[in-house]
Structure formats: C-alpha cells, structure tokens
Amino acid sequence: METNPFTLGFGKTPHTFISRTSEIQNVIEDFNSDLPASQSYLITGVRGSGKTVTMTAIANSLKEEGEWIIINLNPNRPLLETLVAKLYDQPDLQPLFIKAKFNLSLFGLGASFEKVAPVSDIEVALEKMLNQVKEIGKKVLVTIDEVTKSENIKIFTSSFQLLIREDLPIFLLMTGLYENIHELQNDSTLTFLYRASRINLEPLDMVSIKNRYKEIFKIPASKAKRMAELTNGYSFAFQTLGYLCWKNREFLEDETALLPAYDDYLQSYVYQKLWTELSPQDRKVLSILSDEKLTKVKELREQLGFSSSMMSVYRDRLKRKG
C-alpha cells in the first residue's frame, strides 16, 4: 500500500502540503538583498496553520543557495551559548576560528592558545565569530520555533539587536502563536521586536486545496471543491481530511460517515488544546456566540453586556486564536 501523503504530526513538513509561496519568497528576497528591509521576521498564526512548515521552507531554500548557515535553536535552552556552540561545530567555520586563535575554552569549546586570553563574554565571542563569517561572504540564519515571552528569548533578542547594529550577517526567523508574539512585541524592554516584520498566516487558498485533492485522489472537481470547503482553508484540517480519506477511501463517497471521524480528529488534535488555552471570559463569549437564536450583532452584544468597541476587540482576539 502506498504511503499516506498526508500527516497529522505538528512541526514536521508533510509529504504533501500547500506552500505559501508569496510569503516565503518575500522573506527570501529580503534576506538576500544588499540592504534588507528587515533582518528578523516573526511568523504567527493559529495552532496548526503551518508556521513551522513555512519557516522550514524558507530555511531550506536559503540553505540550498550555499551562502547561508542555518542554525536551529531550542527556545528552552540558553540561546546565545547554544548559538556559539553550533557555529563552532560548523565544518566550514571551525578552521577559521582556530586560525584566528579564538580562545573559547571558558565555554567548553576548542582548545586554549598560549598567550591568548580566553574570551569571557558570550556576546563578544559571538561578535568575533560573526565577523569571521562576514569575511568569507556568508550569512547566518537563526530559526526558533514556538517562542514565548521567556527570559531566554528576551536575552537573545536584545543581543541580536546589538549584533545587527554592528552590521553583522545574522538573521532571525521565529514562529509563535498570536498571543505569544503579541506579548513579546509589546514588552517595553523589547522595542526592537515591535518593529520586526511580522507574517500573519491567513487561510490557505481554496482553489489550491481543491486542485491538490483532485490531483491526489483522482476525483471530480466538484467533489474536490466540497472537500476544500470542509477545511475552511485551515492547514491542519487540509492534512486531517486528506489523511482520513487516504486511509479509508469509502469516506470519499460517504460524507455522512466522514464528518464524525473528521470532527473527532480535529477535536483530539486541536480543539481541546485551543479550548484549554482560553480564559473563562473567552469561553463565555464563545458559548454565547454559538447560540443560533442570537443572529444579530446587537442581540449578541446585549447578551454579553459589551459595547460595540469591546465586541470588535473580542471578535478579533478569538478569531486570531482560532
């Protein structure tokens, strides 16, 4: 039996996915320009919208060009120390650092050199290393997935700002849920991030979803269109629906049997997590919004006790949360 081209795993690039070509190309072109508009991009969206896949696609494309060194960092580890260690381990760079007699022994890297004082500050070490990278005409892209407002991130982004002010070839891609990115950008100590370019991942193009289903399942355009409508442009729903129909081809002919299984998977993988992350007030608002008897905005506002402006704020917040 052929391998299922769809996947339910988060973070890993699926065998089949709909690339966000425009967003990806814009970042690549900016990073490759002589005077980039931004050396940092924040990719945000609801859970399962394809943030990690988009970031990975950008990193892989740049890596293929040969001028880029890609460093993936874990947001829960000391970021500056890990970046220095990973740069030192790069086969193309380590000989340069040794030749330049960088004494990084205090960080557990390489050997100490006679009459060469060890570098004692991690930012100084990173600056020296990036200057070597600059001399050979290369650039460093740092990727960090699923960031939150943590001390690790605050320290790293503050240092990153200093490095780009020194005109060093370091670039940054970070992904995160809307509320986490919003919290980071509004931290008074991280004004640099407030000015960082942000990519908000919108729903996938419905025509692209339809065409992909039509191609993979060899089904009529009308049936593929109906499947696309069931996803509502949600990236994880595109994968889930495709996964189920590949696993059980009878679902392609029997929507009545498909829908309960489809809802169960979305509930287990996404909806339960989204619900637990909502505040009690958010849950109350959603419960009232789901009341089919309340069809007019005015009726909803009165039931919630919201002003027009408050209603708009909540609607926008909940939409961004998924």
Model-derived segments and their meaning:
Residues 1-41, 89:
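A short, basic N-terminal segment
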Residues 36-57:
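Walker A/P-loop nucleotide-binding motif
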Residues 40-41, 56, 60-78:
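Conserved catalytic segments around the Walker B and adjacent sensor/switch elements
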Residues 67, 78-109:
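Conserved NTP-binding/hydrolysis module of P-loop NTPases
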Residues 196-224, 230:
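Conserved small helical "lid"/interfacial subdomain of P-loop NTPases
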Residues 239-308:
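Winged-helix-like regulatory helical subdomains adjacent to P-loop NTPase cores
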